[in-house]
Amino acid sequence: MTMTTDPATVDCTPSPLVRVRRKPGRARYDMAAVHAVLDAAPFSHVATVRNGRPVVLPMAHGRLDGSLVLHGSHAAGLFRDAAAGSPVCITATLLDGLVLGRSARNHSMNYRSVTIHGHATAITEPDEVIAGLQAVVEHLIRGRWQQVRKPSTAEIRETALWRVPLAQASAKTRSGSTLDPDDDRCLPVWAGHIPARLVFGQPIAADGLPPGIEPPDYLRLLPTAPAAPPPVSSSRR
């Protein structure tokens, strides 16, 4: 993805701020685990406190030099909060499946998640803005940066990018089936887990696209759903 350091060489130290207390056996604090979730998650949710009230917004992100890069507008209240020194909490979550237990209490989900605590710092140097924007674009669609027009000097000035170090981060995952107690295993209720994943539909061309411009090959790397079977026709006798 957009990493420039070896994830095996940098680990998160689990401070009390990020240490997982509920189901701690599902937690990981190494950078490889944190990076893997961030790279797979299409976007993240960023939380801050504004006028004494919590605010959470979804944002596009990328990874660069041990930091998470966030892309938004200079006018966004979230970035004004960050400029004023407000700490941020960032989460990214992937739904991997539904877990159906035999009792109402034992329903759950399989997931991969990351939580990050820190402060956001504005990226202002033109070269760093370009590198940060490349990280965000390549996270969205790998291979896209090489094909599109690069930002102009004016666009670089107008682009709002912020970085949050990954020094305080934790990953947490759940996989597998239901954990029903032995007493429930005899109940006549279906139990198990249903895998889930994000899939994409067929590309739809923008209005005004000149004839002959086909979808790029890298779009074929996106996961797609299996084609639906043709409808079964019936005839009345």
Please name every model-derived segment.
Residues 1-21, 63-75, 111-120:
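N-terminal short leaders/motifs
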Residues 4-10, 32-35, 53-67, 99-113:
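Short N-terminal helix-initiation segments at or just after the protein's N-terminus
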Residues 14-69, 80:
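An N-terminal domain-cap segment
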Residues 42, 57, 64-66, 84-88, ...:
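A generic structural signal for short beta-strands and their flanking turns/coil linkers
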Residues 44-46, 68, 120-121, 169-172:
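Short beta-strand segments in beta-sandwich/barrel cores
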Residues 74-135:
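Short, structured beta-strand-loop surface elements
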